[in-house]
C-alpha cells in the first residue's frame, strides 16, 4: 500500500511539473493578438479536458480526473456534466463535440426514473442547460428533454405555500422536504428557478411553469423583509422565513441575483423586480458592507442574528458574483459610457457601479494574496482589528478551492461594461494559476483539471493537494466566463441576453397580456399582493413539448382567444 502511494506521488509529481511548465503555457498561438491568444488558451483547456472526460467518464455525472473514472449520483445519469457544459461548446463553435453530446442526450438521457433530485440544482444546471442549448440550436431534442424534466420537477411546488420543497422525486413527482434545517427550503434555491421556468413557458406557450415561479416570488415578498434583506431559510408549509441569518453567500446569494435578472429578462418591463432589487441593494449598503484593515478592502459580511445584530466579517467566495451584478444593474447591460449619457443615470447608479468595482477588486485579492497558489479559498474572514497586519485569514476548513466562477464572472461583466483592460489582466492571472495548480496530465499526456483541498500549502512532495474531482461548473461557468472575458466579438451581448446563475444565456423577451407578472407588492399590512386569475391546468396530464413554429406571442394570443371563446 505504501509503495502504491509512493508511486502515485511520483506520477503526480511528474504530471504536475509537466502541467505547470513554469507557469507558462505550452500552446502555440503565434500570429494572434494577446487577448486572442488568451481566449485560444481557454478554448484549448476546455477541449483538452473535455476530450479526456469523453474518453474516461462519458455520460457520468461525477468525474474523478486522477482516478480517470466517473460515477452517477443516482441509478441512472442526469446529464450533470454533458448538459451543463453543452452551451459552452456551442458558444465556442465545437460542432463535433456538440454532436456527440446531442446524440447522448437524445438516446441516453431520461428524467422519469425513481430518484430524488435537488430542485434548485437540477433546474439551474439541467433545465437551464437544455433551454440554452435549444436557443442556440433550435433543435427540438433539447426542448423535448426540458419539458420532460420540468414535468418531473413541478411536484416540488405542490406545497401549502407554493414555496418549492428542496427535493423532488423524478418518477412520482412528489416534493420532499429538506431532511435538515427543520424541513426549511433555502431562500436562494426557492427564488432561483424563475428565469428557467419563465423562459420555458415563453418557448412552449404553457403558462403553468410561469405561474409556479411567480407564486414563489409573491409569497416571499408578502413577508415584507426589512430593507430588502431576507433570511436564508423559508418554510414551505407556511411561506414564512425561518431563522434570522442574512447573507449573500450560500443559501442567500442568488435570491438577490434573480431580482435584477427577472427585471432584465423581460426587457425591464416588470418594475416590481427593479423595486425589489433596488431596495435590497440599499439594504446591503446599509447593513452588510464594511472595509478591512489595513488595506481597506470592501467586503460584504453576514448578519448571524439578523438586522440589528453584529456584522460577521466572514465572506464566501460565492459572494463575489455581487460586484458584477451591481455593475450590470447600474447600466442595464449598456456600456458604462452609454449608460452615463442617459438621463436615468444618477448618483445612485454611480455608487452601485463603484461598489461593484470595489467588491470585485476585493475578490481578485482573495486570489492574488493567497500563497503559494494564487487561488482563492472557499471562505475568508476579513480583519477589522488595527493591531493585525493581514486583511483576511483563512480557517483550516475553508482552504479548499472548487474552481468556482464568481470572481471571473464579475471580471467578465466589468470588462464588458468598461473596456478596462485591468479586468482582463486580473482574469488572466487567475486563469494561469488554475492552469498551473489544478491541471492534471496522465501518462498518455491527456489533460484534466481537479479541485484543490488546500490553496495555502502543497503536500509533502511539493504538489498541489488535489481533491480528484471536476465540478460541472468548471466548464459550464468558470471557463465560459474566461472565454468570454477575452472575446473581442461581443459574443452574447449583455443588452440582448441574461445569464442564469449557472451561466446559461437566455435571450431577453417582451411581456404580453398572457406572460407577465400577475401580482403587485404588498404596500401595507391591509393590502395583500393580488395574483391574477389564470387558466386551470390539469397537472395529471401535463403537455408534451410542442416547439412553436410561430412566435410565442402569437401562440399566447391564440390561447387567450380560445379561453375567451
UniProtKB/Swiss-Prot annotation:
Kindly list the cofactors needed: Ca(2+)
Compositional bias (Basic and acidic residues)? 526-538, 550-565
A Pfam family of the record is Glyco_hydro_47
Chain sites annotated for binding Ca(2+): 501
Reported EC number(s) for this entry are 3.2.1.113
Q: What family classification does the UniProt entry report for this protein?
A: Belongs to the glycosyl hydrolase 47 family.
Q: What's any one GO cellular component for it?
A: endoplasmic reticulum
The record's catalysed reaction(s) read: N(4)-(alpha-D-Man-(1->2)-alpha-D-Man-(1->2)-alpha-D-Man-(1->3)-[alpha-D-Man-(1->2)-alpha-D-Man-(1->3)-[alpha-D-Man-(1->2)-alpha-D-Man-(1->6)]-alpha-D-Man-(1->6)]-beta-D-Man-(1->4)-beta-D-GlcNAc-(1->4)-beta-D-GlcNAc)-L-asparaginyl-[protein] (N-glucan mannose isomer 9A1,2,3B1,2,3) + 4 H2O = N(4)-(alpha-D-Man-(1->3)-[alpha-D-Man-(1->3)-[alpha-D-Man-(1->6)]-alpha-D-Man-(1->6)]-beta-D-Man-(1->4)-beta-D-GlcNAc-(1->4)-beta-D-GlcNAc)-L-asparaginyl-[protein] (N-glucan mannose isomer 5A1,2) + 4 beta-D-mannose; N(4)-(alpha-D-Man-(1->2)-alpha-D-Man-(1->2)-alpha-D-Man-(1->3)-[alpha-D-Man-(1->3)-[alpha-D-Man-(1->2)-alpha-D-Man-(1->6)]-alpha-D-Man-(1->6)]-beta-D-Man-(1->4)-beta-D-GlcNAc-(1->4)-beta-D-GlcNAc)-L-asparaginyl-[protein] (N-glucan mannose isomer 8A1,2,3B1,3) + 3 H2O = N(4)-(alpha-D-Man-(1->3)-[alpha-D-Man-(1->3)-[alpha-D-Man-(1->6)]-alpha-D-Man-(1->6)]-beta-D-Man-(1->4)-beta-D-GlcNAc-(1->4)-beta-D-GlcNAc)-L-asparaginyl-[protein] (N-glucan mannose isomer 5A1,2) + 3 beta-D-mannose
Instruction: Name the pathway it acts in.
Output: Protein modification; protein glycosylation
| Source organism (scientific name) | Candida albicans (Yeast)
Active site positions, chain numbering: 378
* Coiled-coil intervals: none
Q: Which UniProt keywords apply?
A: Calcium, Disulfide bond, Glycosidase, Hydrolase, Metal-binding
Keyword Manganese present in the record's keywords: the answer is: no
The disulfide bridges present are: 320-363
Enumerate the SUPFAM superfamilies for this protein. Seven-hairpin glycosidases (SSF48225)
Per its record, how is this protein called by name?
A: Mannosyl-oligosaccharide 1,2-alpha-mannosidase
Amino acid at each position: 500500500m505504501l509503495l502504491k502511494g509512493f508511486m502515485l506521488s511520483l506520477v503526480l509529481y511528474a504530471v504536475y511539473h509537466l502541467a505547470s511548465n513554469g507557469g507558462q503555457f505550452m500552446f502555440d498561438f503565434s500570429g494572434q493578438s494577446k487577448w486572442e491568444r488568451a481566449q485560444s488558451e481557454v478554448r484549448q483547456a476546455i477541449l483538452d479536458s473535455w476530450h479526456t472526460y469523453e474518453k474516461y467518464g462519458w455520460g457520468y455525472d461525477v468525474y474523478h480526473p486522477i482516478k480517470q473514472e466517473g460515477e452517477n449520483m443516482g441509478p441512472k445519469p442526469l446529464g450533470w456534466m454533458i448538459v451543463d457544459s453543452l452551451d459552452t461548446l456551442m458558444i465556442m463553435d465545437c460542432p463535433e463535440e456538440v454532436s456527440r453530446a446531442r446524440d447522448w442526450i437524445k438516446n441516453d438521457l431520461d428524467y422519469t426514473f425513481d430518484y430524488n433530485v435537488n430542485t434548485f440544482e437540477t433546474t439551474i444546471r439541467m433545465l437551464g442547460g437544455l433551454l440554452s442549448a435549444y436557443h442556440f440550436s433550435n433543435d427540438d431534442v433539447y426542448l423535448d428533454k426540458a419539458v420532460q424534466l420540468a414535468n418531473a420537477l413541478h411536484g416540488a411546488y405542490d406545497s401549502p405555500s407554493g414555496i418549492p420543497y428542496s427535493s423532488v422525486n423524478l418518477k412520482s413527482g412528489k416534493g420532499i422536504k429538506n431532511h435538515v434545517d427543520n424541513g426549511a427550503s433555502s431562500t436562494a434555491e426557492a427564488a432561483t428557478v424563475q428565469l428557467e421556468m419563465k423562459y420555458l413557458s415563453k418557448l412552449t406557450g404553457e403558462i403553468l411553469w410561469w405561474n409556479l415561479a411567480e407564486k414563489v416570488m409573491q409569497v416571499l415578498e408578502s413577508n415584507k423583509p426589512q430593507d430588502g434583506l431576507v433570511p436564508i431559510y423559508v418554510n414551505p408549509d407556511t411561506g414564512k422565513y425561518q431563522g434570522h441569518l442574512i447573507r449573500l453567500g450560500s443559501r442567500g446569494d442568488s435570491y438577490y441575483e434573480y431580482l435584477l435578472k427577472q427585471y432584465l429578462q423581460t426587457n425591464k418591463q416588470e418594475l416590481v423586480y427593479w423595486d425589489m432589487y433596488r431596495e435590497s441593494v440599499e439594504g446591503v449598503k446599509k447593513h452588510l458592507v464594511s472595509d478591512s484593515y489595513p488595506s481597506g478592502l470592501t467586503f460584504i459580511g453576514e448578519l448571524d442574528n439578523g438586522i440589528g445584530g453584529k456584522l460577521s466579517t466572514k465572506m464566501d467566495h460565492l459572494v463575489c458574483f455581487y460586484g458584477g451584478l451591481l455593475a450590470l444593474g447600474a447600466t442595464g447591460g449598456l456600456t458604462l459610457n452609454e449608460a452615463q449619457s442617459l438621463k436615468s443615470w444618477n448618483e445612485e447608479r454611480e455608487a452601485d457601479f463603484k461598489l461593484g468595482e470595489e467588491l470585485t477588486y476585493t475578490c481578485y485579492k482573495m486570489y492574488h494574496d493567497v500563497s503559494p497558489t494564487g487561488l482563492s479559498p472557499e471562505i475568508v474572514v476579513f480583519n477589522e482589528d488595527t493591531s493585525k497586519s493581514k486583511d483576511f485569514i483563512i480557517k483550516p476548513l475553508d482552504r479548499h478551492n472548487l474552481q468556482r466562477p464568481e470572481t471571473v464572472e464579475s471580471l467578465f461583466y466589468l470588462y464588458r461594461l468598461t473596456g478596462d483592460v485591468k479586468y482582463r489582466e486580473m482574469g488572466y492571472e487567475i486563469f494561469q494559476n488554475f492552469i498551473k495548480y489544478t491541471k492534471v496530465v496522465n501518462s498518455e499526456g491527456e489533460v484534466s483539471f481537479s479541485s484543490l483541498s488546500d490553496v495555502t500549502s502543497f503536500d509533502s512532495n511539493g504538489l498541489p493537494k488535489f481533491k480528484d474531482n471536476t465540478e460541472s461548473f468548471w466548464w459550464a461557468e468558470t471557463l465560459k466566463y474566461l472565454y468570454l472575458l477575452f472575446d473581442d466579438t461581443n459574443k452574447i451581448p449583455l443588452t440582448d441576453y441574461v445569464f442564469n446563475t449557472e451561466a446559461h444565456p437566455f435571450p431577453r423577451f417582451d411581456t404580453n397580456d398572457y406572460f407577465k407578472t400577475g401580482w403587485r407588492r404588498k404596500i401595507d399590512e391591509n393590502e395583500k399582493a393580488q395574483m391574477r386569475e389564470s387558466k386551470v391546468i390539469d397537472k395529471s396530464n401535463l403537455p408534451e413539448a410542442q416547439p412553436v413554429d410561430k412566435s410565442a406571442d402569437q401562440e399566447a394570443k391564440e390561447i387567450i382567444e380560445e379561453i375567451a371563446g
